[in-house]
Amino acid sequence: EGDFMSTLVIAEHDNSNLKPSSLNTLAAANAIGGSVHLLVAGSSCQAVADACAAVDGVEKVLLADDAAYANQLAESTANLIKSVATNYSHILAPATTFGKNVLPRLSALLDVQQISEITEVISEDTFKRPIYAGSCIATVKSNDATKVITVRATAFDPVSDSGGSAPIEAVAPENVSDLSSFVGEEIAKSDRPELTAASIVISGGRGMQSGDNFHLLETIADKLGAAVGASRAAVDAGFVPNDYQVGQTGKIVAPDLYIAVGISGAIQHLAGMKDSKVIVAINKDEDAPIFQVADYGLVADLFDALPELSDSL
């Protein structure tokens, strides 16, 4: 095992562009050591394969370009990965909806235990991952011959997307599943940046009192070029749709600036944003737990503070 180290990273993409989380996942692969290959499964996705070939440190790109993979349905994608898995000691994907859907199926097919949401590589078989909503970090060691791992993208700096020139090798479709078929998708359109990609995020909690009041955040977000997020309490109360949700059961974000407004700071919310570079909290309750992680705190009524903030921008 020790003399055979080779990692396959499953690229996340939309058939035209590689998603940034794949570059963070590659950083984890580099930390493991050994050779690193990328698998692109899609349809009419040569552009993605070309982009992958240019990524720094990638030795080879495997391209499965077939109509069967147009929507990267998890059943077929897992079967495809299994067909090449014997060549690799480690198989990694970002811990996104995509990675969390595909890799557990692969783990079952390979009969190994998946290691989820790693935040650090200690050695080729030992990793750190958060548990209990991020309040503890577990160090786990795997004895499986093939290590199947999802990577928390925010914990790793992305590798450079240029400087490489890897060969691209075609892979044939394998055991395409008819268990599921793609019916359609509804994508929320927004002029604001996507939550996990934004460098500034402003989030509202139960203290916002209504969905209408989120316009106070939106005005500020548009002045700052920020994304708008929310706590689970705000989502459960119906103030905003659940794609706004930041936290353990929502999106994990680590922007340069995170502004928490009317959010008390339950541990599940902190799990989703505590790695942000600078955290600013506005809350009228001076005992709110959010102030314990905030770099800057303002004890104030948000309905006074937000208009003032907006006017000063």
Where are the language model's segments positioned?
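N-terminal glycine-rich FAD/FM-binding segment characteristic of electron-transfer flavoproteins
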Residues: 1-313
